[in-house]
Amino acid sequence: MLSRFKCSRLQLQKRAISVTKATTTTASQPKRRRTTTFSDALNKGPSFEDFVSGKAAKFTLDPLQQARSNIEEAKRLPRWLKVPIPKGTNYHKLKKDVRELKLSTVCEEAKCPNISECWGGGDSSKATATIMLLGDTCTRGCRFCSVKTNRAPSKPDPAEPENTAEAISRWGLGYVVLTTVDRDDLADGGAHHLAETVCRIKQKAPKTLVETLSGDFRGDLEMVKVMAQSGLDVYAHNLETVKDLTPHVRDRRATYEQSLSVLNQAKKTVPTLITKTSLMLGLGETDEQVLQTLQDLRAIGCDVVTFGQYMRPTKRHMKVVEYVKPEKFDYWRDKALELGFLYCASGPLVRSSYKAGEAFIENVLRKRANN
């Protein structure tokens, strides 16, 4: 009995020594996270013991995370795209008049970065506003645009043409831009409403030059003729982007060829009419695609083109692929003039109705009128 007890005691001692050795060995080696199927890269990171001991700081950042950080750094807003907060006497006056007359402006609806410069005006330059007609709700949903959308917007305000003309006469502008939301719910796309507004402005302020920035009227060229013959001075319709990106950027009802046909018809209807379009850069377009677009525009006699940086209005809209440097915008301006465009405004903050372009076009139109 005694020998059995000694034997059992000896076995227990051996087991205790074995467990102690195993514990000592395990404690000397920090535990690593067990392999998972989530990502091999994650398993190469520091363990909990590394964080406790302070060794985690020696680990290099996961390459995937490093790549994401680099992308985010590149996406930060460059200094040349930062603008001041809107202010000034003219700015507040225009804003007050717009509210009183129940008008909408694309400057506000589209969150234009130039609103401070255009509305602010100054001693040597008159304030400029782009008035948006046919309401503030569009029937289309382009991926770059922040204007509200609805399949059935409210009916056009019959007093809008008169109110718009009254506002223009109050401001004493030498040049005004009228734009519209797309109204596919209307039989004529709103062409007659816009044409009437142009006529009222010419009656109340005959010296004011009028530019209209309108949609494609679903490709109805008869409505393009109505607009071209309304008495306006500049017919603007935006291509927005190059041909290959159009299906991904614009509403499916807007096509590259359809937009070219609108500009072409306007020029054919009134050959002396200045035609104008605008392109956004930073959407992933190539130089070859931009050059081809310029050549397509010159082939139909388009007179003016503007280039501006695409700015993502909200996180719900398409992302910016690239922030194009100012030097590249200078390159495209020179290229456009080389191809024969009458004028080209090109810069990160330039928009289709940018006032620097309007001042130039105003001078061209007045010289034509005097000759």
From Swiss-Prot:
<dbReference type="Pfam" id="PF16881">
    <property type="entry name" value="LIAS_N"/>
</dbReference>
<keyword id="KW-0809">Transit peptide</keyword>
<feature type="binding site">
    <location>
        <position position="138"/>
    </location>
    <ligand>
        <name>[4Fe-4S] cluster 2</name>
    </ligand>
</feature>
<dbReference type="InterPro" id="IPR006638">
    <property type="entry name" value="Elp3/MiaA/NifB-like_rSAM"/>
</dbReference>
<dbReference type="InterPro" id="IPR013785">
    <property type="entry name" value="Aldolase_TIM"/>
</dbReference>
<protein>
    <recommendedName>
        <fullName>Lipoyl synthase, mitochondrial</fullName>
        <ecNumber>2.8.1.8</ecNumber>
    </recommendedName>
</protein>
<keyword id="KW-0949">S-adenosyl-L-methionine</keyword>
<feature type="binding site">
    <location>
        <position position="107"/>
    </location>
    <ligand>
        <name>[4Fe-4S] cluster 1</name>
    </ligand>
</feature>
<keyword id="KW-0411">Iron-sulfur</keyword>
<feature type="domain" description="Radical SAM core">
    <location>
        <begin position="121"/>
        <end position="342"/>
    </location>
</feature>
<feature type="transit peptide" description="Mitochondrion">
    <location>
        <begin position="1"/>
        <end position="24"/>
    </location>
</feature>
<dbReference type="GO" id="GO:0051539">
    <property type="term" value="F:4 iron, 4 sulfur cluster binding"/>
</dbReference>
<keyword id="KW-0004">4Fe-4S</keyword>
<dbReference type="Pfam" id="PF04055">
    <property type="entry name" value="Radical_SAM"/>
</dbReference>
<keyword id="KW-0496">Mitochondrion</keyword>
<feature type="compositionally biased region" description="Polar residues">
    <location>
        <begin position="20"/>
        <end position="29"/>
    </location>
</feature>
<feature type="binding site">
    <location>
        <position position="353"/>
    </location>
    <ligand>
        <name>[4Fe-4S] cluster 1</name>
    </ligand>
</feature>
<keyword id="KW-0808">Transferase</keyword>
<keyword id="KW-0479">Metal-binding</keyword>
<feature type="binding site">
    <location>
        <position position="145"/>
    </location>
    <ligand>
        <name>[4Fe-4S] cluster 2</name>
    </ligand>
</feature>
<comment type="similarity">
    <text>Belongs to the radical SAM superfamily. Lipoyl synthase family.</text>
</comment>
<keyword id="KW-0408">Iron</keyword>
<dbReference type="InterPro" id="IPR031691">
    <property type="entry name" value="LIAS_N"/>
</dbReference>
<feature type="binding site">
    <location>
        <position position="112"/>
    </location>
    <ligand>
        <name>[4Fe-4S] cluster 1</name>
    </ligand>
</feature>
<dbReference type="InterPro" id="IPR003698">
    <property type="entry name" value="Lipoyl_synth"/>
</dbReference>
<feature type="binding site">
    <location>
        <position position="142"/>
    </location>
    <ligand>
        <name>[4Fe-4S] cluster 2</name>
    </ligand>
</feature>
<feature type="region of interest" description="Disordered">
    <location>
        <begin position="20"/>
        <end position="42"/>
    </location>
</feature>
<dbReference type="GO" id="GO:0046872">
    <property type="term" value="F:metal ion binding"/>
</dbReference>
<feature type="binding site">
    <location>
        <position position="118"/>
    </location>
    <ligand>
        <name>[4Fe-4S] cluster 1</name>
    </ligand>
</feature>
<dbReference type="InterPro" id="IPR007197">
    <property type="entry name" value="rSAM"/>
</dbReference>
<comment type="pathway">
    <text>Protein modification; protein lipoylation via endogenous pathway; protein N(6)-(lipoyl)lysine from octanoyl-[acyl-carrier-protein]: step 2/2.</text>
</comment>
<dbReference type="GO" id="GO:0005739">
    <property type="term" value="C:mitochondrion"/>
</dbReference>
<dbReference type="GO" id="GO:0016992">
    <property type="term" value="F:lipoate synthase activity"/>
</dbReference>
